[in-house]
Design a protein with these regions (language model features):
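Long, low-complexity segments enriched in small/aliphatic residues
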Residues: 1-66
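Long, contiguous, secondary-structure-rich segments that constitute the structural scaffold
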Residues: 1, 59, 64-77, 81-170
Length: 170
């Protein structure tokens, strides 16, 4: 087979062409270039991300460990410098609010978390009918999710771009 250098973008397949950068994705990319990634806290909003904690596999696992076990801890992580600027510290109770609702959380500070970001634990919440007991600080991140906010490139929910505010619980 002979080497042939492609001079145009995309793959050439006979008369058709695969467009690796559709116009809709190109527009979305250009819109994103005008925004800055979550960086230092603005004092108003944080980007909320979620994930599982090391010992957690799903909501039901909160019933597997005895009271006082660290694996049963339900917290929301905040960067330690962001927390200090807001007068918050590990163990404080706080309210995290988005456009669709609010949740009550217990904070845990972390130097490893990027500034301007809150990290919630996936899969917790006190409304599951199979749970024998709920843990203090349990929350459901879905209460903050806007089902109408869709990511323009894929049409999926904007779980990775949820903006929230945080304040100490009164």
């Amino acid at each position: 087979a002979a080497y042939r250098k492609y001079e145009k973008t995309g793959f050439v397949l006979g008369e058709s062409r695969i467009d690796l950068m559709p116009e809709a994705l190109r527009r979305y990319r250009d819109e994103l270039r005008g925004t800055s990634p979550a960086g230092p806290v603005s004092g108003k909003t944080f980007r909320l991300i979620s994930g599982r904690s090391p010992w957690q596999t799903h909501t039901i696992t909160q019933d597997l460990y005895p009271a006082g076990d660290a694996r049963r801890r339900v917290t929301m992580l905040i960067n330690d410098r962001d927390a200090e600027e807001l007068g918050l510290q590990s163990g404080d109770k706080a309210v995290v609010s988005g456009t669709k609702g609010s949740i009550r959380v217990i904070l845990e500070t972390s130097a490893d978390l990027r500034r301007g970001v809150l990290r919630g634990q996936y899969g917790w919440g006190t409304s599951a009918c199979l749970l024998r007991f709920s843990l203090e600080g349990s929350y459901n991140l879905n209460e903050l999710t806007d089902a109408d906010a869709l990511e323009p490139a894929t049409g999926d929910a904007c779980f990775g771009d949820l903006r929230v505010t945080i304040r100490r619980e009164k």
